């Protein structure tokens, strides 16, 4: 019975560890010319947690593997990206027609 209890607790703890937020970083560029985009909003979908890209188009934030990042910038199509197991996320935004 104790073995079963320890097995259950071990599985439950591993799920909790997997769901924890991890630092994610990346870069957002323009699909038109490959230049970094400054000031792109990067938000975790369904939350108010987010950040903006810097002068190099780089961003950093904490997110879980199940989180979806929403990238938005004036004049560009909004893009959603599932974090998954990626710690580095490269995103290209396309201009609106």
Which residues does each predicted region cover?
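Sec-dependent N-terminal signal peptides
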Residues: 4-13
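Periplasm-facing N-terminal accessory domains of Gram-negative outer-membrane beta-barrel systems
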Residues: 7, 18-97
